[in-house]
Amino acid sequence: MATFLSEDFLLGNEFARRLYHDYAADQPIFDYHCHLPPEQIAENTRFKNLYEIWLKGDHYKWRAMRTNGVAERLCTGDAGDREKFDAWAATVPHTIGNPLYHWTHLELRRPFGITGTLLSPTTADDIWQRGNALLAQDDFRARGIMQQMNVKMVGTTDDPIDDLRHHKAIAADSSFDIKVLPSWRPDKAFNIDAPGFNDYLQKLEAAADINIGRFSALCDALKKRMDHFAAHGCKVADHALDVVVYGEADESTLDAILTARLSGKLPTPEQSAQFKSAVLLFLAAEYQRREWVQQYHIGALRNNNSRMLASVGPDIGFDSINDRPLAEALSRLLDAQARQGGLPKTILYCLNPRDNEVIGTMVGNFQGEGTPGKMQFGSGWWFNDQKDGMQRQMTQLAQLGLLSRFVGMLTDSRSFLSYTRHEYFRRILCQMIGGWVENGEAPADITLLGEMVKNICFDNAKNYFAIELA
């Protein structure tokens, strides 16, 4: 019987253990997509307690707590920090089988060094006290944790109207050598059917100092803001395509759609598809020109619980997996980008694992131009960010493409404690490849496979995003 969370956690054979300990474990972290608040890095935030760094803003934990019968005031409400932590501690023993159980104890082990103690109501006070004592030390401020975890680069998620002053401050600080770069997230500029679209355009007008009355003016405003992002080192764009649509329209039609929307008239589904497609085509051409990477996160069904949305807002754990078809519209969108000469490096993520093979084969349609792995099938995302989901994604990527060219893991997280997800991913990767060797499905060539693992853990991403590191 294996020991829980030992040094060989998830590594079921000797070859897997060699791959992990000799090639994967010590690789730096290139976290190219996350939701860390850049101001906390700029200010080198000192977190006052475990709740603040660990539970606050974590919708994964809130979903589990609600399922365990925890009242909302102990999740997102007005309860005290210790009360909320105790509610989480009481939930953790019930999460066995959920990745939260693994993540929780990996995060206690690194960076806190808390091992051999499982979080529960019995141990909550001890862990609370030990964790808080460490958080009072400089090594456990925001930057210290990043340095402890051997992070080399993080890409935050930022709106086109953001002034990026925190990124500027970080870049100007010669005492901190981790790259913290903005990522361009222009969803609000193309979601023309969203309730706040008109209000957002006013903010974009102010940020770009351009009056947006026509489609060309919207493009000019976005281009000006991209210049601002580029000046702060941006090399990556990210887009939430909850539903993939495609439509074609000339500029006069796009002007009419925009004018009608600005006057308060909602677009038809066809008009919405035309407008979104036109903006994404324009953006893709700009990304190609600027040598940016574009990411599409596909298939979330958001804000399902309207009562809770009205009560506590979005992004608090009431989203799930959509099952809308995506293949044809995605094919037409990517093909249109390629035809205009503007298909940049692209990473596609799907939330519905049913779509893995769709994405795995779609990226193969647009590879080439001398760039290894130009089109990427992105790592298991959100509800697939767990052992089974990662194995499925990597297995299907290997079967339909080249696993060796995969850019690997990202945290997609709001927490400074989530870097152990890279460790989790690396253990799963090494176990999968070690299993192939064990079954005679891959050669027992430690140099060949070790280099492959090393590349997937760090080097592929470093080369793909072409970001100069310290």
Curated annotation (Swiss-Prot):
Keywords carried by this UniProt record: Isomerase
Enzyme Commission number, as recorded: 5.3.1.12
Catalysed transformations (reactions): D-glucuronate = D-fructuronate; aldehydo-D-galacturonate = keto-D-tagaturonate
Catalytic class of the enzyme: isomerase
The keyword Isomerase appears for this protein: yes
GO molecular function: glucuronate isomerase activity
GO biological process, any: D-galacturonate catabolic process
Keyword rRNA processing annotated: no
Pathway(s) where this gene product acts: Carbohydrate metabolism; pentose and glucuronate interconversion
UniProt xrefs under HAMAP family: UxaC (MF_00675)
Recorded family membership: Belongs to the metallo-dependent hydrolases superfamily. Uronate isomerase family.
Protein name (database record): Uronate isomerase
